[in-house]
């Protein structure tokens, strides 16, 4: 078999007159009265191959048997297309290949999906036949971008003198957040490894070990409820460094991301990125990962609401809640009563009891609650919300968390429906100064907002024992277009501070020692100040490639129920395998 001389998408007018050897898949076959045209495809693109009896009867006879997705080896001569046959939408659109020989390397059944960017297959079919789905150019281009992003990051970190170090996949189960995936040990009867949710503890131990600068393209595993932007196994760019301040870490990440954007996407973004404190993000956008490509910020009306004539507002404030609103500029005529009812049902998903609304008309406020506001109150509302005729005002009165969640989500929905978002923009944002701990009323305990190893502000360390809810974290999230790209922090590196953190999280001294004794002991041997960040590679590629689902950036992803339709994993195992592990199943019968 002759060697391939050209990739299909790389045959251009410079090759006219040359004999070429091409190998690829049949994208399309057209029989035009004695001539057969085939679009031959490989990962670089498509080239048109012509089978003409005057050139080779033998090749034409073979071409008559060929169907879509056959794998071919074609030998032929490159010629220029006629003036009326030029296709400037293709890189190879000015030439075609006159076939002299063709060899069928492999035949193909009719595929269950159309191998094209626009396919009619459902996602389940695409996942079941993922190897066919991956043939679509849009999928290859996504993974080419993933490769380019990863290569750029590796090259950048190499110039910054970071070492790539692999950390264990089989590790210890620790209560860090989501449920662990557990792996039974055959050698240690009744004991289990856990797959890592992140390399957090190991990268900190590498800092104890004096490596100073570490990174890893790390596989991580979390047994959690899935959604469009979550997978049970995912990849993060894991970075840790000693002796750097928060500003130095953020500056380095900005330089890395601007290089990624330029090299992988061809987009120039300016640094430094804007910074916003967590409290401000929640107050202004109702989100800890705000999409700043459009305005429509939340306005706090609690002070006004406390003295207005609308009881729903006043009672919310009196009970410790708040009232906030968003002004959808010029949207009054675009939303009917039925449309607003749909918005009301939407905010109820986020815990809101309802959605109050007003439309601003030339002669004043109109809507179900307009009668509760006199002229003076109406003017205050209009001025506070900077409202003018044609605006739609939307209000939620509830607990602070419910107000933020519901209006934050509503803001994003309206931004999309009103086409306020410039999809060509890439708006990076740092969200800083996070709360260190969050209180869970159901569990009646505090949980770490990021993880238990986050360093509090120095002046807040004592608050861990007196007022944990007031302690602030030296933590930072990188946000892009309303998506959390990654999170990081400066880390605790002193045993006494780490023990205070564990105590605030409800660990007894014995539990902390049992779970994290190795880390606490390490902190007694001269641990350097350190910090880092973990960036979600899958999510970054999703945003840069313009995809809407993480599954499109992972070669062989899982479904929303964490199953693989291709291999049918998870699956039962043989009884002998269970016996070898001394395991017995207690499977609940379906009712």
UniProtKB/Swiss-Prot annotation:
Residues that, per the record, bind L-aspartate: 176, 222, 450, 491
Residues at which ATP binds: 222-224, 231, 484, 536-539
Residues annotated as site: Important for tRNA non-discrimination: 84
Gene Ontology annotations for the cellular component aspect, listed alphabetically: cytoplasm
Subcellular locations according to the entry: Cytoplasm
Pfam annotation, one family: GAD
EC number: 6.1.1.23
Domain of life of the organism encoding this protein: Bacteria
Spans annotated as Aspartate: 200-203
GO molecular function: aspartate-tRNA ligase activity; aspartate-tRNA(Asn) ligase activity; ATP binding; catalytic activity, acting on a protein; nucleic acid binding; transferase activity
Keyword set, alphabetical order: Aminoacyl-tRNA synthetase, ATP-binding, Cytoplasm, Ligase, Nucleotide-binding, Protein biosynthesis
One BP annotation, GO: aspartyl-tRNA aminoacylation
Family annotation (PROSITE patterns): AA_TRNA_LIGASE_II (PS50862)
NCBIfam families in alphabetical order: aspS_bact, PRK00476.1
Role description: Aspartyl-tRNA synthetase with relaxed tRNA specificity since it is able to aspartylate not only its cognate tRNA(Asp) but also tRNA(Asn). Reaction proceeds in two steps: L-aspartate is first activated by ATP to form Asp-AMP and then transferred to the acceptor end of tRNA(Asp/Asn).
Record's subunit section: Homodimer.
Family under the similarity heading: Belongs to the class-II aminoacyl-tRNA synthetase family. Type 1 subfamily.
Record's protein name: Aspartate--tRNA(Asp/Asn) ligase
């Amino acid at each position: 078999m002759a060697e391939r001389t050209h990739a299909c998408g790389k045959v251009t007018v410079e090759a006219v007159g040359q004999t070429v050897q091409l190998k690829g898949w049949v994208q399309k076959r057209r029989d035009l009265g004695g001539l057969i045209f085939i679009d031959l495809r490989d990962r670089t693109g498509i080239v048109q191959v012509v089978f003409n009896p005057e050139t080779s009867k033998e090749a034409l006879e073979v071409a008559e048997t060929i169907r879509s997705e056959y794998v071919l080896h074609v030998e032929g001569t490159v010629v220029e297309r006629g003036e009326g046959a030029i296709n400037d939408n293709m890189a190879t659109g000015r030439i075609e290949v006159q076939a002299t020989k063709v060899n069928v390397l492999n035949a193909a059944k009719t595929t269950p999906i159309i191998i094209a960017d626009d396919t009619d297959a459902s996602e389940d079919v695409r996942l079941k036949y993922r190897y066919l789905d991956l043939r679509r150019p849009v999928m290859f281009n996504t993974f080419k971008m993933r490769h380019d992003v990863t290569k750029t990051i590796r090259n950048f970190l190499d110039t910054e003198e970071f070492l790539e170090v692999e950390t264990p996949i089989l590790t210890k189960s620790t209560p860090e957040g989501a449920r662990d995936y557990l792996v039974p040990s055959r050698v240690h009867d009744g004991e289990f490894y856990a797959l890592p949710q992140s390399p957090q503890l190991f990268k900190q131990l590498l800092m104890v070990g004096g490596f100073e600068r570490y990174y890893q393209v790390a596989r991580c595993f979390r047994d959690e409820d899935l959604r469009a932007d979550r997978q049970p196994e995912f990849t993060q760019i894991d970075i840790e460094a000693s002796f750097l301040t928060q500003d130095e870490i953020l500056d380095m990440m900005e330089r890395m991301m601007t290089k990624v954007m330029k090299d992988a996407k061809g987009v120039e973004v300016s640094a430094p990125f804007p910074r916003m404190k967590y409290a401000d993000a929640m107050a202004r956008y109702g989100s800890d990962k705000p999409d700043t490509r459009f305005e429509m910020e939340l306005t706090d009306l609690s002070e006004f609401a406390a003295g207005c004539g609308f009881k729903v507002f006043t009672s919310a404030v009196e009970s410790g809640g708040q009232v906030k609103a968003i002004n959808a500029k010029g949207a009054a005529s675009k939303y009917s009563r039925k449309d607003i009812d749909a918005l009301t049902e939407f905010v109820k998903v986020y815990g809101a009891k309802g959605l109050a609304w007003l439309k601003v008309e030339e002669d004043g406020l109109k809507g179900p609650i307009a009668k509760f506001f006199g002229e003076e109150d109406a003017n205050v509302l209009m001025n506070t919300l900077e409202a003018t005729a044609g605006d739609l005002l939307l209000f939620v009165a509830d607990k602070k968390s419910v107000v933020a969640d519901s209006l934050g989500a509503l803001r994003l929905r309206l931004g999309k429906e009103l086409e306020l978002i410039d999809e060509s923009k890439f708006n990076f944002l740092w969200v800083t100064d996070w709360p260190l701990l969050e209180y869970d009323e159901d569990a009646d305990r505090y949980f770490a907002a990021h993880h238990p190893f986050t360093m509090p502000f120095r002046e807040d360390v004592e608050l861990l024992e007196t007022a944990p809810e007031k302690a602030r974290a030296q933590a930072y999230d990188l946000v892009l277009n309303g998506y959390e790209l990654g999170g990081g922090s400066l880390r605790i590196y002193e045993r006494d501070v780490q023990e205070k953190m564990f105590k605030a999280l409800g660990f007894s001294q014995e539990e902390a020692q049992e779970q994290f004794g190795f880390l606490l002991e390490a902190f007694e041997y001269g641990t350097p100040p350190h910090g880092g960040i973990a960036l979600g590679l899958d999510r970054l590629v999703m945003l840069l490639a313009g995809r809407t689902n993480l599954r499109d950036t992972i070669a062989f992803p899982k479904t929303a129920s964490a199953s693989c339709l291709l291999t049918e994993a998870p699956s039962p195992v043989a009884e002998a395998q269970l016996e070898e592990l001394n395991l017995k199943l207690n499977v609940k019968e379906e009712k």
